[in-house]
Amino acid sequence: MVKIRLMRLGRHKLPSYRMVVVDSRVKRDGSYIELIGHIDPINGTNKLNGALAIEWLKKGAQPTDTVKSILSKEGIWKQYAASKKA
């Protein structure tokens, strides 16, 4: 199964994350299929490629709960739901 999940980066107590598409059997920080974006919770910045995320969701990639929440806040999940109905 292919998942969209977060990969942790950064040093101790200063995390940043990459949103990546991975095989569910791969370790959290293991190799990934494709990079969708960057998330920096310290500065509150998100740089996501919405079109790429929607493309992978249409292909059947399953987002984790945290990723789904982030996609909802960015408005990407709403775009995906609208494209799914059309």
From Swiss-Prot:
<dbReference type="GO" id="GO:0006412">
    <property type="term" value="P:translation"/>
</dbReference>
<dbReference type="GO" id="GO:0015935">
    <property type="term" value="C:small ribosomal subunit"/>
</dbReference>
<dbReference type="Pfam" id="PF00886">
    <property type="entry name" value="Ribosomal_S16"/>
</dbReference>
<protein>
    <recommendedName>
        <fullName>Small ribosomal subunit protein bS16</fullName>
    </recommendedName>
</protein>
<keyword id="KW-0687">Ribonucleoprotein</keyword>
<dbReference type="InterPro" id="IPR023803">
    <property type="entry name" value="Ribosomal_bS16_dom_sf"/>
</dbReference>
<dbReference type="InterPro" id="IPR000307">
    <property type="entry name" value="Ribosomal_bS16"/>
</dbReference>
<dbReference type="GO" id="GO:0003735">
    <property type="term" value="F:structural constituent of ribosome"/>
</dbReference>
<keyword id="KW-0689">Ribosomal protein</keyword>
<dbReference type="GO" id="GO:0005737">
    <property type="term" value="C:cytoplasm"/>
</dbReference>
<comment type="similarity">
    <text>Belongs to the bacterial ribosomal protein bS16 family.</text>
</comment>
